Each structure stands twice: as structure tokens, then as C-alpha cells.
Amino acid sequence: MFHELKQSKDFLALTLAHPQYLSESFEFDLGEHTHVEVWDTGVIVFSPKQAKHSKDIVLSCAVHGNETAPIELCNALITQILSEELTLAQRVMFLIGNPAAIHNGTRFIDENLNRLFNGAHSRDEGLCNPERIRAHKLEQYVDRFYASQSGERQRIHYDLHTAIRGSKHEKFAIYPYRPGRKYSREQIMFLESCGVNTILFHHEPTTTFSYFSSENYRADAFTIELGKVFPMGQNDMTRFIAMKEMLTLLMTGKDLQLPEFDLKRLNLYQVCRSVNKHFDDFEFNFTNDVENFTAFPKGYTLAKEGGKAVKIEHEFESIVFPNAKVPVGQRTVLMLKTADDSNLD
């Protein structure tokens, strides 16, 4: 496998050739400058040997296997590093979240992987399916990556996705709930420079991958939506040039040249509530082609279930991630209201 990767420099191909696991981990050096470790299928770590690094960066993709643009983006960056076109100045771990689902061409195999972090994988039925086992392993890899360095360091985790539904804001990011910690203006402007100018501030703990890293390691973590789902090879990668350029600057230690914080360049939303499904007959009162961030007025009947109406409570609320087909007990939609910059640092 070592020789296969050294020759092809295609980490995605190696991962998809071994979607369940690698028979052994391996490591090697790139010249005199970078140490490379492959811990498992879809798990590769790059550590600068010479540079005095101060950041530990996790870039994850394919937590949902059919969200292909982030997979192609991450694999392109990995190939550039393995080809020594990029010399890193910071530690970086790339995670290809659900190789079996990529191989299958589906969002997941048995269960939504991004509902299984922060220990959720071991609740109820326990480690009973591929996603639960993978979530447990991914948590261990993140812990190992962050815990191996001591002292004052910045921990970053960008979990990259694409959305099933069209959106009034093509690219947006979810900033996990972080009680007692203000949100970072610098991180928000980094995302704005990546072409992600819409930020959702979450209102409660969740079981997402980004929340896991934020809560347990105080990482600057985000779930980042980069547009709409397309089949592998059919993504217009020119739409991700800014993201790739900024990630390259971050990893190689170059000056990010971030603009001053400017509210006029941003769309800020506060998640005001989650609407969970309580009955099998849950249905939305809008068509399937309604876009993310569509706003509805107070009193509008958003959905119906169990003979009762779910109504809009604030003057206006916007929707994101509506999905009536989730199992009973899970979230069907996040409701948003506009936010200001009062909770930013």
C-alpha cells in the first residue's frame, strides 16, 4: 500500500480500494520536510519536520458518501502535498469520513454518520453498524491527532459537505454551539475569504462531527456546506477555487491577508429552534423544491403531524436542511432568524 500511494499519489483511490479498513498502518517521509502517516483507510496525517508549527488542522469530507465536491477538493490537496508541490508549515489531518458509502454511491450505509458523534455511536444499540463503528474510530483519530501536541496551539476542524437541496446562499457554515466562548471574527472572515459568507450560529449541543471537536478540544470547528450534491466527476471545481487557495495558505503558513470584519459582507443567522419528528405522518407544508434559507412569516403552518400544526413563531423564520423522511425522534428542519455581531470576539 505504501508503494501504491507513493506511485499514484491518489489517496482517494487507495481509500476506495480498501473501503472497510487497511490491513496495516504505514508512514514515510517526503524529502526532508514532511512526515506522512496513514492510520487507517481515509485517514492521513502530514507533519512538518522542520517548521515550527502552531496549528493542528483537521479537514474532513465524505461524512456523507455522496457529497463529492469536498472529496475531490481534499484529494486534490492531498495529491499536491504528496507530489511535493505544497510544503506544509502546519500539521494537517485529512479524514475521508465514510469510504464504504462513497464506494456505494450513497449518503450512508445504515445510519447518518453526522448524527453519531460526541458519543452517540455507543448509545442505544451501541456499535451495531458500519457508521457507528466508523464514528467511534474517527473520534479516536481526532483525539490522537490533537492530544499528541502540547502547549499553546490553535486547533481547527473544517468538516466539508454539500447539501441535497438548493439554497438561496450557495455556500454556508454552521458554527457549533459553544457556551462560554464567543464566536471568532477572524474565523468568520477566513470563511468569507473562502467564499462562505453565510454563518449559522447553533443554539444547542448536537452529535455532529464539528460539534465534537469544538466541545471536546476547543477547536475552531465548522460544518461547511459548499453547494449542491453532484455525482463524482461532475462538480464544477472552479466554484471552489477560493476555498482551495485559502486552505493552501493556511496549511503552508502564508499570510492569510484577511479583510477587516465587515458585517455588510456577511449573512448571519441564529438557529432559534429545531423541529423534531414525533409521528410517522409528519409532512411539510411546502414543496420539495423550496430552497434552504426560504423565509416564512409568523403564524404560517410550516408542517403537520399527529393532527397538529407546527407554526412559525417569530416575525420571520428561515428554514435549512428540511427533511421529513428522517426517523421519528430526529430533527426535520432547523429554523433560523437573523443575527447580529453582538456575540463575536
From Swiss-Prot:
Biological process (GO) annotations held by this record are: arginine catabolic process to glutamate; arginine catabolic process to succinate
Could you tell me one molecular function GO term of this UniProt entry? succinylglutamate desuccinylase activity
Q: Which UniProt keywords apply?
A: Arginine metabolism, Hydrolase, Metal-binding, Zinc
Q: Write down the InterPro entries for this protein, in alphabetical order.
A: AspA/AstE_fam, AstE_AspA_cat, Aste_AspA_hybrid_dom, SuccinylGlu_desuccinylase
Q: What is the cofactor note?
A: Binds 1 zinc ion per subunit.
Active-site residues, as the UniProt record annotates them: E225
Which Enzyme Commission numbers does its entry carry? 3.5.1.96
Xref: Gene3D superfamilies? Zn peptidases
What superkingdom heads the lineage? Bacteria
Keyword presence, Zinc = yes
CDD domains in the cross-refs: M14_ASTE
Q: What family classification does the UniProt entry report for this protein?
A: Belongs to the AspA/AstE family. Succinylglutamate desuccinylase subfamily.
- What job does the chain carry out? Transforms N(2)-succinylglutamate into succinate and glutamate.
The UniProt entry, under NCBIfam families, shows: arg_catab_astE (TIGR03242), PRK05324.1 (NF003706)
Name this polypeptide is given? Succinylglutamate desuccinylase
What is the source species?
Shewanella piezotolerans (strain WP3 / JCM 13877)
